[in-house]
């Protein structure tokens, strides 16, 4: 059979087996017919009570224990390595496994704490996972390309292979984090699903009939299974927010320049019209905030020429808290509600989530106002993406396929940049103009809108990224938070006779209440450019309210049950 395989298929198969071989034999599991939902009690069945206690804790709770010495970094690291190994065997979410190196780092952290009485940093002993765009010493960065296996970004015999480390990795190590795995991505990174020829398709842990999202889909799936308490992805069109939404997690798309991108691999590197940004994903809003603040404390602008000199701004956080606590309706926060983007209406579960959030906000005395809503990515006609696929001769993945297109020249790129700037100005004027609609006399403080037209999507049916990509064009801050799960008993919304577009009708026709049942639904909380402190603080408040209104467990310090 192997003799019938092409060279790229053999290379992919060997890499896939190498990933499995990196899992200790004692952590291998037999794969019977799996249930649809492999979260919660199912994956817990492979763990000890102590491992469950550790891995169900969020990043804030873990660092409270590790920095004080109540939990050893080794014990915490081993627990998450075990759970991550199981997670990969259930949903195909890992590209690189370096558990032994992680446990050695954890031992050194324990020795440091014992010798000095002080933690190495605020992330001391915290396991952190990474999307397979970040270079880590000793392991590959394939980004899903078979042609990148055993190379440095497709370059054979490059001395940087398995030696170079991304700036984010260096800073995480300085903060005391324990890096232990890298997670799956779709080839090209330009997809709302995650699939490649190395590990196959990354499934949604809550519903294995559905996608984990993309392009940080491996991060979403792993963290949803509590195989990691928090990690980092990247976002150029929704690639942090979509997996966060599809997996019931928290995900932040900060404005460009807040997180250090130096030394990370990327598709279409050098394309500056819309910048890819790094953002954290976590099981709690507290964990998200912890990671974001910790990286800023390292002053990344000293090491990355594109990072902005903006530390965490306590004054903005405190001012936002003051607005939240205002008793006067005339001074309180106000919100824009974007029900659809003018092209595609969301499917029923997402509509329910939007209506629910508006009900909560109005019930709390906040004003809500309706909010309304290219040729940016393929400036090289897809040439960069196709060239990396061509390195091995591998076939294209249907969800990530790229067709050769027009190669834009410098004049045309400049014209697109002018269009982008004009769009940004129009939207800025529109946002500022909402001051006429609010009782505060201020523009709306934030906008709530869908992350996608659907809950976690049926494979092959991610058809519309409009709810996320416009935010990248604006370079606005966006934070995804979980609201609930799809309910199949919403008959009043399953009939429509009028549609915004042919695509709208097609996406509505994709809806299947039985298949989507139980799928996580998240929404976006959007702020203007560089408003991360404000949006994170508002999200903390909103999560408390969602918990109160739904009776869910504490969304501030742990997400919905996984």
Task: Show where each model-derived region lies.
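Short helix-loop capping/hinge segments that flank enzyme active sites or metal/cofactor-binding pockets
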Residues: 41-50, 124-151, 209, 327-338, ...
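Residue-level signal for inorganic ion chemistry
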Residues: 80, 102, 288, 335, ...
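An N-terminal boundary/leader segment
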Residues: 1-111, 363-366, 548-562
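A short helix-breaking turn/cap at a secondary-structure junction
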Residues: 42, 253-355, 391-395, 548-562
